C-alpha cells in the first residue's frame, strides 16, 4: 500500500441505526448515490449480512459513506447489494478519496481484524455527476482487479438500432396483432 502523505484529518464512524436520517439525506444529495443505498432498502437483508457500513467525516462534515458488511476476515462493499462503493459528497476530491481508502485499510485491519477488502464500484451510468475518484485510488493503492461486470444502457432520446432478427420479430408481432399502448386503466 502506498502511504498518503497529506493529513486531511478524516475520521471514520461506524454506522448505527440512529444515523439513518443523516445517512439517507447524504445519499439523496451525493454525486453518485442511488436508491440502493437508502437504509430501508439496505436493511431489507440485514439478517443475512453483518452490516459494517462506515461514515467518513472531514473537519466535522460528512464527506463519504461506504455501505459494507463483513464476513470472517473479509470486508465487502456491500455483499447484499448489486453494487457498492464509496458514496461521495460533491466536496470529495481524488485526494480525499485516496486518503479515505488508506484510512479504511488501517481501520479495518486494526479495529475489525479484516485482512481483505472486496470493493465493488458504483457503475458510472448511475452517477448524478461524474465520479470515479475511487478507481484512481484503487490504482494508486495497487489494488487487484478480480472481477469485471458489465453495465449497459440505452438512452431513450438517442434510441438504439435494432438488429435484422429483432426487426423481423417485431414485424411478426405486429402481423399477429400485438400492440403496445399506454393506458391509465390499471383495473383492466
Regions found by a protein language model. Name each.
Residues 122-127, 159:
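Short, internal active-site loops enriched in acidic
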Residues 23, 60, 119, 180:
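A residue-level signal for conserved active-site and pocket-lining positions in enzyme catalytic cores
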Residues 5, 25-28, 40-111:
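Conserved donor-binding loop and adjoining core beta-sheet/short helix segment
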Residues 94, 125-130:
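Acidic-and-aromatic substrate-binding clefts and catalytic sites of carbohydrate-active enzymes
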Residues 112-123:
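Conserved GNAT acetyl-CoA-binding A-motif
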Residues 1-20, 131-188:
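Acyltransferase donor/substrate-recognition loop-hinge adjacent to the catalytic core
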Amino acid at each position: 500500500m502506498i502511504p498518503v502523505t497529506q493529513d486531511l484529518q478524516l475520521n471514520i464512524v461506524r454506522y448505527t441505526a440512529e444515523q439513518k436520517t443523516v445517512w439517507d439525506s447524504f445519499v439523496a444529495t451525493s454525486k453518485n448515490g442511488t436508491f440502493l443505498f437508502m437504509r430501508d432498502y439496505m436493511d431489507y437483508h440485514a439478517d443475512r449480512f453483518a452490516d459494517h457500513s462506515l461514515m467518513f467525516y472531514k473537519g466535522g462534515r460528512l464527506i463519504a459513506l461506504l455501505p459494507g458488511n463483513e464476513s470472517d476476515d473479509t470486508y465487502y462493499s456491500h455483499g447484499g447489494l448489486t453494487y457498492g462503493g464509496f458514496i461521495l459528497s460533491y466536496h470529495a476530491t481524488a485526494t480525499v478519496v485516496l486518503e479515505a481508502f488508506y484510512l479504511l485499510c488501517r481501520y479495518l485491519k486494526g479495529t475489525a481484524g479484516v485482512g481483505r477488502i472486496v470493493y465493488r464500484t458504483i457503475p458510472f451510468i448511475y452517477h448524478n455527476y461524474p465520479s470515479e475518484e475511487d478507481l484512481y485510488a484503487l490504482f494508486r493503492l495497487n489494488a487487484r482487479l478480480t472481477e469485471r461486470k458489465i453495465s449497459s444502457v440505452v438512452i431513450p432520446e438517442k434510441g438504439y438500432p435494432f438488429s435484422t432478427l429483432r426487426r423481423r420479430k417485431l414485424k411478426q408481432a405486429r402481423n399477429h396483432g400485438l400492440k403496445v399502448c399506454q393506458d391509465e386503466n390499471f383495473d383492466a
